[in-house]
């Protein structure tokens, strides 16, 4: 008796071991869309549950049938085959004939009947007579119409009929969606609670007028406008649905809380241009009920120290039109340049409809300096203007698409304070483009020109120097310019630089980069310098951290290789 039971026990143990061995699935017979949907349904099953047992096969069949039903296939044939000694469960699927839409009856009534957005959503839904049934398209359209109604102020909208009927034996499906939107509400009076700023200033940030059709995007824009002023620590804009008076005007309620009167910020940084750097910032986001503000910053590094203070006076268009008065004091001790620069400027800012930011300014510059063999004090009054535009689309803190253009022209005359007649032109452009998820291109061009009667009377801050982390990699910071009779750097009348960089995603937020930089700072004829190399980028919350290994091809032997490290925005 015992001898007979041993083989039975041994077989049972083998069967149990096979049942718990790791099993993989092979599914064939399905086209890509069907295969993808089946995979999505099966993703809820942990691989540890995979088995060749009949119970698991039944579970698997149920999920596959549900996945195929969702795309209109109600007559699938599913066969299972255990292969490779129980290590593979093969699933052979014949999806069968597809169920098609025999009737598509979609009707919008109410004030949204001729609304182009509703018409567009319906036309793009994919629900058309004769097309294969897709439950996802039906569910998506149903929720899209409801969401669109809420976004556009049809708050009383309701479905009169919403049915999807399937006759599997006929391979036919019938869609009935009848939606009554009701009336469309309009923006009514707006009330503001908690504001310390003048009522008219706050009202100017409202992107809609009383009586305009309701749009949730306008509510979001209003919220963003209020936040962008930095006057408030919290902002909440919402329709006051509890105070409807039976008409179509929807009261709006704005709740804000004042920002702190003083904000302080400290920071430590490092770049190979200036070495370790410490910063301190003090800001008063609002000074009075008219929304005036004050900001100041102090930065110290070994070659450069500066302090700035600015006072901002917003105008009727609070965010885009304002006056700014700024004073800055900067000390430089770098290579052959020692200077103490004092700048006082008055600026008028506008944003034009095309997205360009326009600034008209006049600045008063006094600079005491030693530049090579020159030792002097210069003063200039420089009126001018700047046009700039920045466009960007972000994925987190990484710019996936963007560009920036800046042009500045300023003029000084020896008939009014300035040491010599000078016209200065500065221009720059940067472009970022992304291909797919793993490829980025970064392109930069920049330059400047001094059209001057007596170049020797220009202080260092008005001359050009090239080289450094953000200019010409492979060369030291501001190490490129013509030299004077003593061999010291003298600064240049002109400068032109450019850069081409390709980046490839290595993993997650890590990117590799290869680049070529070129340019020169010169007086008459450029002698182009080239820097090339490779680097690593890490996308941090405050912008990309960049580590580059660069070779300056025209550098002196022994000085051609340089490491560049920097952190900050790419545009």
Summary of predicted features, one role per range:
Residues 526-534, 538-540, 548-551:
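Strand-loop-strand
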Residues 370-373, 380-506, 514-518, 522-523, ...:
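C-terminal outer-membrane beta-barrel translocator/porin domains of Gram-negative envelope proteins
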Residues 1-8:
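Bacterial N-terminal signal peptides that target proteins for export
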Residues 108, 194-196, 314-315, 340-345, ...:
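Flexible, surface-exposed loop regions and adjacent strand-edge segments
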Residues 21-33, 43-272, 281, 295-313, ...:
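Periplasmic polypeptide-binding modules associated with outer-membrane biogenesis and secretion
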Residues 16-19:
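N-terminal signal peptide c-region/cleavage motif recognized by signal peptidases
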Residues 73, 330-339, 412-421, 553-554:
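Outer-membrane beta-barrel proteins
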């Amino acid at each position: 008796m015992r001898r007979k039971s041993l083989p039975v026990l041994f077989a049972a143990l083998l069967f149990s071991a096979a049942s718990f061995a790791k099993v993989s699935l092979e599914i064939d017979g399905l086209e890509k869309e069907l295969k993808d949907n089946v995979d999505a349904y099966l993703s809820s099953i942990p691989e540890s549950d995979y088995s060749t047992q009949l119970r698991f096969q039944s579970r698997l069949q149920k999920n596959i049938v549900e996945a195929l039903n969702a795309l209109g296939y109600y007559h699938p044939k599913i066969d299972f085959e255990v292969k490779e000694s129980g290590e593979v469960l093969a699933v052979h699927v014949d999806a069968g004939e597809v169920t098609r839409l025999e009737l598509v009856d979609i009707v919008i009534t109410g004030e949204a009947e001729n609304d182009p957005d509703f018409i567009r959503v319906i036309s793009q839904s994919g629900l058309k007579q004769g097309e294969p049934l897709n439950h996802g398209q039906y569910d998506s359209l149903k929720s899209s119409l409801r969401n669109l109604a809420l976004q556009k102020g049809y708050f009383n909208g309701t479905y009169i009929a919403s049915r999807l009927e399937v006759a599997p034996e006929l391979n036919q499906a019938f869609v009935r969606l009848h939606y009554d939107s009701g009336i469309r509400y309009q923006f009514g009076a707006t009330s503001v609670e908690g504001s310390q700023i003048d009522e008219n200033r706050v009202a100017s940030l409202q992107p809609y007028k009383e009586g305009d059709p309701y749009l949730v995007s306008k509510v979001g824009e209003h919220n963003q406008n209020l936040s962008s002023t930095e006057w408030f620590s919290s902002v909440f804009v919402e329709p006051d649905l509890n105070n409807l008076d039976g008409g179509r005007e929807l009261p709006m309620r704005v709740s804000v809380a004042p920002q702190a009167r003083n904000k302080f910020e400290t920071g430590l940084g490092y770049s190979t241009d200036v070495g370790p750097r410490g910063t301190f910032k003090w800001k008063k986001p609002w000074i009075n009920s008219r929304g005036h503000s004050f900001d100041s910053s102090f930065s110290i590094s070994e070659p450069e120290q500066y302090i700035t203070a600015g006072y901002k006076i917003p105008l009727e268009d609070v965010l885009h039109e304002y006056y700014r008065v700024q004073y800055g004091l900067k000390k430089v001790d770098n290579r052959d340049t020692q200077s103490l620069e004092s700048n006082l400027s008055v600026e008028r800012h506008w944003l034009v409809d095309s997205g360009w930011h326009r600034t008209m300014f006049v600045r008063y510059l006094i600079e005491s300096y030693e530049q090579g063999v020159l030792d002097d004090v210069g003063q200039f009054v420089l009126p001018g203007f700047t046009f700039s535009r920045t466009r960007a689309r972000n994925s987190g803190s990484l710019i996936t698409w963007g560009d920036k253009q800046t042009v500045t022209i300023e003029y000084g005359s020896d008939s009014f304070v300035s040491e010599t007649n000078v016209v200065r032109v500065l221009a720059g452009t940067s472009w970022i483009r992304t291909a797919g998820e793993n490829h980025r291109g970064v392109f930069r061009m920049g330059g400047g020109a001094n059209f001057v009667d007596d170049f020797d009377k220009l202080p260092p801050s008005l001359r050009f120097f090239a080289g450094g982390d953000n200019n010409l990699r492979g060369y030291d910071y501001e190490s490129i310019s013509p030299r004077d009779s003593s061999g010291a750097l003298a600064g240049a009348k002109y400068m032109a630089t450019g850069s081409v960089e390709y980046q490839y995603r290595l993993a997650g937020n890590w990117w590799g980069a290869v680049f070529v930089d070129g340019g020169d700072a010169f007086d008459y004829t450029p002698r182009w310098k080239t820097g090339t190399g490779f680097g690593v980028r890490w996308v941090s919350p405050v912008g990309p951290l960049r580590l580059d290994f660069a070779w300056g091809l025209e550098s002196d032997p022994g000085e051609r290789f340089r490491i560049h490290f920097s952190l900050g925005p790419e545009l």
